[in-house]
């Protein structure tokens, strides 16, 4: 089920991109881009969707738009994808804003936020609350345009050996977070 929903979402997104970027494929010359990835294609959902996205764009454009997916490290290290796109050494990147925090401190707000809003609330903020516009303004300072291609639900961040009853119980506790932990 999850795989079918993901494929449908990627198909719709890719269709929109093809019409915006390519238009009439027969009247266009071929565009070939390199897309560096921060995720290996064998990683469920976020990794496997990169090559699917590339292939769908190629098919729907009749080959006029060919974005070649590169595994992490093939063009640049995984955490350097954003910088490679900003500098022009790759035309596209398959990454997450959470990996851009060193360059853009606000970037994690455009990805999964630990203990943050649920998926519906987050998508509403992006679309109706100015989230996309804010992201576009921030990324434009680096010459990059971000497109939200996939949504990962917020991290619950917690299977613990003992019950958490107060903030004091969190002191010294180690928890994994993808981009940054709340202060």
Model-derived segments and spans:
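N-terminal secretory signal peptides that target proteins for export/translocation
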Residues: 1-6
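Bacterial N-terminal signal peptides
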Residues: 9-20
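Boundary at the C-terminal end of the N-terminal hydrophobic targeting segment
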Residues: 25-29
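Extracytoplasmic "Venus flytrap"
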Residues: 34-50, 72-76
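Short, polar/charged alpha-helical segment
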Residues: 42-68, 183
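Contiguous mixed-secondary-structure segments that line small-molecule binding/active-site clefts
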Residues: 54-55, 86, 91, 96-183
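Short beta-strand-to-loop elements that line the ligand-binding cleft
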Residues: 67-76, 175-177
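Short, hydrophobic alpha-helical packing/hinge segments within bilobed ligand-binding/sensory domains
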Residues: 78-82
């Amino acid at each position: 089920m999850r795989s079918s929903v993901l494929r449908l979402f990627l198909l719709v997104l890719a269709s929109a991109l093809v019409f915006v970027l390519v238009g009439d494929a027969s009247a266009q010359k071929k565009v070939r881009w390199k897309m560096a990835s921060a995720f290996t294609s064998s990683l469920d959902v976020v990794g496997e969707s990169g090559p699917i996205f590339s292939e769908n764009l190629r098919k729907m454009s009749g080959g006029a738009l060919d974005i070649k997916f590169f595994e992490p490290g093939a063009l640049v290290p995984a955490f350097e994808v954003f910088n490679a796109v900003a500098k022009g050494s790759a035309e596209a990147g398959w990454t997450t804003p959470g990996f851009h925090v060193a360059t853009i401190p606000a970037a994690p707000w455009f990805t999964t936020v630990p203990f943050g809003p649920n998926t519906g609330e987050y998508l509403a903020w992006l679309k109706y609350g100015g989230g996309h516009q804010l992201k576009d303004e921030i990324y434009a300072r680096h010459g990059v345009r971000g497109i939200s291609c996939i949504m990962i639900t917020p991290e619950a961040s917690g299977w613990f050996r003992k019950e958490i009853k107060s903030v004091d119980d969190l002191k010294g506790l180690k928890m994994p977070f993808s981009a940054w932990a709340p202060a």
